[in-house]
């Protein structure tokens, strides 16, 4: 780790070992000495070209820190940030977390919470009203959150929401079937080999 008065230069290449014994290597994009936080730009974990992962490391929790290559030229100017877009993303994330917290505190079943998340991926205009899911202020889905529990004016909105609910529970059933199959398959193999 950088000693008192030592800093990591922006653009330097650094290698370190995390507390989970993972070796990381990347380019320094920021370093804050008082908080001992180091931001490294590493190759993208998705493998996509022209993408990178930015990792924030607390130097109190890493070891074997070594500078592989010091930056010899002046670093490029920092990229501009779209503050409006970031604020909007943060606001939406906060609203989503508050909605999840509300559902949990209201005692909504796990099926209801999962259905809400599925609907919210397609239709952002959905909210909780006690234990009911309200979609586009037109469709109300009450517990136990099945297709027959969808109420609203006949029309495209109700039909669309019913299709989403139907597909959600069909996908859940298929997922349960996939999880059960390996066990059933191994039991068949055991009984036929005996």
From Swiss-Prot:
One of its GO terms (molecular function) is RNA binding. Keywords: Cytoplasm. The lineage of its organism: Eukaryota, Metazoa, Chordata, Craniata, Vertebrata. It comes from the Eukaryota. One of its GO terms (cellular component) is cytoplasm. It holds the Pfam family AD. Residues 79-173 form the AD domain. Residues 1-71 form the Sm domain. It is found in: Cytoplasm. It comes from Xenopus laevis. Its main location: cytoplasm. Residues 176-194 have a biased composition (Polar residues). This is Protein LSM12. Belongs to the LSM12 family.
């Amino acid at each position: 780790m950088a000693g008192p008065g030592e800093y990591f230069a922006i653009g330097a290449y650094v290698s370190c070992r995390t507390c989970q014994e993972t070796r990381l290597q990347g380019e320094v994009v920021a370093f804050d000495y008082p908080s001992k936080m180091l931001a490294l730009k590493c190759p993208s974990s998705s493998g996509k070209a022209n993408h990178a992962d930015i990792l924030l490391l607390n130097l109190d929790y890493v070891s074997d820190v070594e500078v592989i290559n010091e930056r010899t030229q002046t670093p490029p100017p920092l990229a501009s940030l779209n503050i409006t877009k970031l604020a909007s993303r943060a606001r939406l994330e906060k609203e989503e977390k508050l909605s999840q917290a509300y559902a949990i505190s209201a005692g909504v079943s796990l099926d209801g919470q999962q259905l809400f998340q599925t609907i919210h991926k397609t239709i952002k205009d959905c909210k909780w009203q006690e234990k009911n899911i309200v979609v586009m202020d037109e469709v109300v889905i009450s517990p136990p959150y099945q297709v027959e529990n969808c109420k609203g004016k006949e029309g495209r909105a109700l039909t669309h929401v019913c299709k989403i609910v139907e597909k959600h529970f069909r996908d859940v059933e298929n997922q349960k079937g996939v999880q059960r199959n390996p066990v059933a398959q191994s039991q068949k193999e055991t009984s036929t080999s005996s």
